[in-house]
Amino acid sequence: MIRPSQLTEAALTASKADECIVLLTETSEANLRWANSTLTTNGHTTTRSFSVISVMQGARGAVDGPSIGTVSGNGADLDEVYAVVAASEQAARQSGPAQDVAPLVEGSAEDDFDAPGATTEIGVFARLADELAAAFRDPGAGARQLLYGFAEHRVATTWLASSTGLRRRWVQPTGTVELNAKVADDLTRSAWAGAYTTDFTDLDFPAITAEVRRRLGWSQRQLELPAGRYETILPPSAVGDLMIYMALTMEGRTTHEGRTAFSAPGGDTRLGERLTNLPLTLYSDPAATGLRTSPFLATSASHDSASVFDNGVPTHRVDWLSDGTINALAYPRAAAQELGGQFTPPPDNLLLTGGSSATAAIEDLVARTDRGLLLTCLWYIREVEPTSLLLTGLTRDGVYLLEGGEVVGQVNNFRFNESPIDLLRRTREVGATQRTLCREWNEWFARTAMPPICVPDFNMSSVSQAS
């Protein structure tokens, strides 16, 4: 069998473009699913994606700049590789000049470039399966409880090769587990918890199970509340969903064009503006413990925060907010040069630190709340107005009423309307940062570490009948 590294070399050898970049990603994935407190399915798949980026100098005239063509396939064999290379060259000839041109990154081959792709197998869930079996045998306190959920482990190996001599390889493991518990006699009573892991060896599944059972216990008393502004504690998962939305809009070009909440009049930006008096730092870091990401940029398509010309550029820590101040925007190299910014790669993980109560657990925030709400997670989040980053969405799987520092019952779900930028400004207390799994974004953005936060006036704009 031809190794992935050999396929990338074959593509570069076949290329007739002036310059060429080849990306190949091989993904090994195992999954486990359960429902009604019974294991239902498991599976293992291996997939491959293969992209060729051809760069043609003056393809449509001598005065034109370089044009690019990107074509993807699955890299099944050499015939397909050659077909993708030819199609990429044809696409480049038919394209107009690229707007994000920068010199391709030079380099040499890493020692592990010829190594095969890393893999996973169904055995990664061995301990989890035993812990699930024990949880299935435990009916839970009070009414009988049913467990539903899904565990997934993906190991993606990426090879990046360029006509400049650059050869890079990266292995990205991603593991997630989501657990939903319901009361057998009333399936509208539901609780959720999730976790991120790289290899399932550090997963505390009994603690996850205990948490959803605790929340189901809180739902024994059902209450109705109207829409309004409530003091609200958001757990790390919900905070993560909101911070991801914010970070992904922190793009240099769109901000200079006046199209984001970080824009200022006259084509300027809000860089340097204090967003909150709390010493909060929101950052991405490829070397973050337990949340590591690729140390180099790899993308098969250009967009406002990344460019195919930047493939192979080293990534680095970026403080998007620094001690409460807007500190960075994402710029490809070409946009940075044009707009007077600094090359800044887009985030692939996200951490929020520096809270007012940096050692406080969510239980501590609850104990200090006279009357308010405790959320489980957010769902179906959509952007309403980009220049203020106003978002709308729904609460899900448990909203709990707090009185006198204790949970006294479960209330109805709500639709909310909030901007994460404005939320940070109004946040009263921030607890300890911990690794978490967001609910809405976890399929695309799983690596986050967030604190719980307390907002004195979270806008529950209407009651939701969803359950």
Residue ranges and their predicted role:
Residues T249, G267-S467:
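Dual-mode signal for accessory low-complexity, basic/Gly-rich regions
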